[in-house]
Amino acid sequence: MKKVFILLALKYYILNSIIRNGENLYKKIVIPTDGSDVSLEAAKHAINIAKEFDAEVYAIYVVDVSPFVGLPAEGSWELISELLKEEGQEALKKVKKMAEEWGVKIHTEMLEGVPANEIVEFAEKKKADLIVMGTTGKTGLERILLGSVAERVIKNAHCPVLVVKKPKKE
């Protein structure tokens, strides 16, 4: 009986810390996805939170144009762009299916630009309360050269960011 009371008290405390003045803090959640395992893991967390707090979810895929700046517009860029958009549609389809299975209202959108910038701007435009995203955990030279999209989103976002790490293989 004591354990049940403690668990109920803990749940009450958590719910009260997330709900202010009778209003849910999480009404709109943004899920940036790239189709990777870690981004799908992040989507699971986001959808679970959305289900618990009756929030809407916005799944976005950003076609990263930064590596292709300066390439001739015709020919190669168009082909690459189409391939990236197809990849994006598949990634968004997976997240949408997951949300629909959980009964969570979802919107999907494809964007073009620098991923961190687009994610932050989209979240601000939608007045998101939370961004949930995955991170691959780059280290060393790779991180110095490429940076971390998640790190830049954390630094620039107007709302909290939940970052889900790649699960360790057992």
UniProtKB/Swiss-Prot annotation:
Protein name: Universal stress protein MJ0531
InterPro entries per the UniProt record, alphabetical: Rossmann-like_a/b/a_fold, Universal_stress_UspA, UspA
SUPFAM superfamilies found in the cross-reference section: Adenine nucleotide alpha hydrolases-like
Highest rank taxon of the organism: Archaea
Pfam families: Usp
Organism: Methanocaldococcus jannaschii (strain ATCC 43067 / DSM 2661 / JAL-1 / JCM 10045 / NBRC 100440) (Methanococcus jannaschii)
Family statement: Belongs to the universal stress protein A family.
